[in-house]
Amino acid sequence: MKLTRRESKNRRHRRVRGKVVGSPERPRLAVFRSNEHIYAQVIDDSQHQTIVAASTLEPELKSSLASGANRDASVQVGKLIAVRSLEKGITKVVFDRGGNLYHGRVKALADAAREAGLDF
């Protein structure tokens, strides 16, 4: 029987999370993509703590964006998460795409974070 899109995404997500682990030296940059918005968190898995977060729901981004569900919004979130991470002294991260394919909005966020100074 063919898998649904949700089942495929959940399987990819479990597979990726089994391999990607954040540490204090290289925390995990986790991306969650919904139909309306995109969210990014830098997480230290050893302490189960979110160090930095950014999303299209934040007032400074939401007012300047036409939509939270396009590549332009993802680029802005990528830049913002990189700036906040660098302020906290985090330069190296492990990228966790979740169950999403590395394409489109997820790739745009990753590329913007790299350009803004994060190393992964």
UniProtKB/Swiss-Prot annotation:
Gene3D superfamilies: 3.30.420.100
Complex and partners: Part of the 50S ribosomal subunit; part of the 5S rRNA/L5/L18/L25 subcomplex. Contacts the 5S and 23S rRNAs.
Keywords, in A-Z order: Ribonucleoprotein, Ribosomal protein, RNA-binding, rRNA-binding
Single Gene Ontology BP annotation: translation
PANTHER family: 39S RIBOSOMAL PROTEIN L18, MITOCHONDRIAL, LARGE RIBOSOMAL SUBUNIT PROTEIN UL18M
UniProt-recorded Gene Ontology molecular function terms: 5S rRNA binding; structural constituent of ribosome
Positions with biased composition (Basic residues): 8-18
Pfam annotation, one family: Ribosomal_L18p
Role of this protein: This is one of the proteins that bind and probably mediate the attachment of the 5S RNA into the large ribosomal subunit, where it forms part of the central protuberance.
Keyword hit for Protein transport: no
CDD domains per record: Ribosomal_L18_L5e (cd00432)
Gene that produces this protein: rplR
Organism: Nostoc punctiforme (strain ATCC 29133 / PCC 73102)
KW Nuclease (keyword) present: no
Region: Disordered, residue numbers: 1-22
Name under which the protein is recorded: Large ribosomal subunit protein uL18
GO CC terms of this entry: cytosolic large ribosomal subunit
Family (UniProt): Belongs to the universal ribosomal protein uL18 family.
